[in-house]
Amino acid sequence: MDRSIFRQAFSGSVLRLIGLPIVAIAGIANTSLVVANTGIAAYGIVNTVAMLGALLPFSDLGVGGTVTTAVALDSVAPRAGLKHKLKAAYFVLIAVAFFIVITASMMGMFALWSPLLGQDLSVSDNRIISVGVSVFGLAVPLGLGVRILIGLGRNDLAVAIAMTSSIFSLAFTAVMALAGGHGMIFSLTSFLGLFSAGLISTFLAHHLLRKGAPTRDASQTLLGSKPIRRYDFRALSGSGALIIITIGLPLGLETGRILLSRTGSPMMLSQYALMAQLYAITWSVLSTASGALWTIFAQRRADPNGSIAIWRWMVVSFGLLSAFGAAFLWALAPWAGSVISHGEILIPPVLAMSFGALLIAQSLHLPAGSLLTTPRQLWVQAVCVLVMAALSLSVGLLLARTMGGAGFALGAATGVLVGQFLPDLLLVPRLVLEGTVRRKSRKYPGQRLVPVNYRGHRE
């Protein structure tokens, strides 16, 4: 296989790995400050609130993925109309931002966060949560900046900007600590960090679009010199399946935290929250490659056999890398959790092992998630995600009776392996080849097209 593909796929992961000490130090310092100013018992719920954004990835309605694909295809074969697709995407996401802000404000006004999180929260805490979720809502349209950068093949820039979010969060936490803040106010820092990074990514993305305009026509960029008079909502045709995917993923992978907040003790929730934070650092190194893979596969849709070969190599590569990452979590997470919490929170080894299993499961599925991006393929993914979510919740609830938080992590790993990775092995080659035949049949409607399998033989 061409080594340039591996370089393109993993350059972002290498950059993330190089920057990992900075992000890790920022995360550890941020957690230490929050624990010191909220207390051990309150840290779990404050961290859960700060991670509410992870439960709302469907807020972009799948528009981000379609924008990445549109920009990636445009970079291979420039075509008119990119600006209309971008404006349609921004129109939809600005509407989503208004909806999130209004909904969050109403929930804070009527103190509805308390029953949702299963906690006895004060009126001021409810309002603080509403402010944080509103900031997250305003950051939703800004998320297209990273999507555009990935589509342009600048995954390295997207990764660098994503890492600044942790640094911004630490800066806001330090300011609040110096100002004498306490309690729920510290849940705002992650939302503010995300918003700040979004501003930077949006500015750079449209700067690069304008810079590359001579190769595609300056009028195609959203900030081009010619006025935009219409929207192209047809470009968002694959968003319906992406909405289901982005709802099903947090439902299967993140709901355990909410259920634990309602059924477990404060210490169990704090242990789970801290372990999830350590897991997120490890997973971010591997998941960074998904953006580059999305672009690589989108630009090679005309070569199905090559795409299938790349997918197979990536499954093996990610499987090996995730095994090392899981070993890291199993060996070091209990020690790291104790250091970060000043010995107050002890992560059980079984919890670390469960998250390690989840890391391997998600990594094995990651290449297929970036490969299957046509509307039909996304609908297949959507069905698999729903199966995954159902398995994750059912198995997690069953195991949590005896394993606590580890049961939810192990349930999620089971859901991903059975609901997503197993279908990948069975369906990916056929779906990729069928997609190529369908596109050619539309291009040559009068000809009979004979599909070939991934070894190049006629079926």
Language-model features: locations:
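Interfacial segments at transmembrane-helix termini and the short loops linking adjacent helices
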Residues: 109-132, 266-270, 331-360
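Signature of the first transmembrane helix
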Residues: 7-69, 135, 237-267, 393, ...
